[in-house]
Amino acid sequence: EVKKANKDYSDLCNAIEMNYIDAVKPNQAHTKNVKKVDEHVNINKPDFNLKEYDFTDGLITNKSNILLATTNADCILLMFFDPIKKAIANVHSGWKGTLQRISVETVEKMQKEYGSNSKDIICCICPSIRKCHFEVEKDVQTLFENEFKDLKLDEIIERKSENKWLIDTVKINEEILQKAGLRKENIIDCGICSVCNSDLIHSYRVEKEKYGLSTAIIGLK
């Protein structure tokens, strides 16, 4: 499995004319922790499964020899690019990360480290589970209702049945990023649901314990 994953990364990097050994991936743990990457830890292989990136769900860099990677199987992945300061970020935002506003944490980190202006930052939302399939019970619904009182709750939380709710975590991220200063037109959502398209994209909800992982990768030329 590890060999296949490494080959998949290598094939992807070759396809986009980037160097596989430049890849860095955090050990995602549904946190709001975002780390800056200035240099590689390994010399001749990617920086995967390193203690330096434990409990980390977002990475930022302004180095052209570093590729930032994240993986998902329903969770939201967001890629950020500041064309003015030449800085990028790659973020894993599952429902727990969304509750902790890791996307906003990332913007603030780019502002602090690189002097980014939020109005310049472009964000791409990758394929992920959508409201049509993100079904939760009362305990999780309450967490979202309490955290996002500043948003229009009727647009992001929909009651499906007596004990089930549908939550639009993509819209939540779009809204909180706009509140953080990103322009609406700079938030680009692919509009693809991983559950609806599980024949093309890995989905934990569909594949269960045999689930695979999709990846998002971004680098500066």
Which residues make up each language-model segment?
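Active-site microenvironment for binding and transforming phosphate-containing groups
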Residues: 1-221
